[in-house]
Amino acid sequence: MAEAFRGEYNQKVDAKARVSIPAPFRRVIEAGDPKFSGGRSSFVLVYGGDRSYVECYTISEMERIEERIRSLPMGTPKRRYLERNMITLALNMELDEDGRIVLPPKGREKLGISPDELKGGTEATFAGTLNKFQIWKADTYAAELAAEEEVLLPPGADMLSLLEETGL
């Protein structure tokens, strides 16, 4: 995979729930949108699953995921779960001419952004995770990140030691 979502960006969410997609992420979205030929690009925002953030996939990556779901036997609990949380609870999103999206109501609900917070102004954190990116409410992201690091690694440990289990 040549193109990847990397980095962490804090972006303002305005009173109309508009938020700018970080420019480096826009390039990856464009590269992963087979119909993109300039102008507006699209991606898929998934708000299903038991988590406090939404995940966003390029159109090409979502097509790969859908193929994997289709390969599961119909009617099985695993397939139904994935269909519901990855397909039903997902939205196609299109960037406007300024590289923004309107965070949909279901996405705002998942992030815990209230109407009052929108009026007063809030921030979202965009976190690149290789083949997808996550959108978090900024303060939730900071708290989760701190808690996760505390559990996974003792202070001063080499983070690459986590790769040793993969055999690479």
UniProtKB/Swiss-Prot annotation:
Any one annotated GO CC term: cytoplasm
PROSITE patterns: SPOVT_ABRB (PS51740)
Record's keyword terms, sorted: Cytoplasm, DNA-binding, Repeat, Transcription, Transcription regulation
Signal peptide, first to last residue: none
Chain segments annotated as coiled-coil in the UniProt record: none
A Pfam family this chain is assigned to: MraZ
Top-level taxon: Bacteria
GO biological process: negative regulation of DNA-templated transcription initiation
Principal location listed in the UniProt entry: cytoplasm
Start and end residues of each SpoVT-AbrB domain: 8-51, 90-140
Protein location: Cytoplasm, Nucleoid
Recorded GO MF terms: DNA-binding transcription factor activity; transcription cis-regulatory region binding
Family: Belongs to the MraZ family.
HAMAP family membership: MraZ
Quaternary structure, from the entry: Forms oligomers.
Protein name (Swiss-Prot/TrEMBL): Transcriptional regulator MraZ
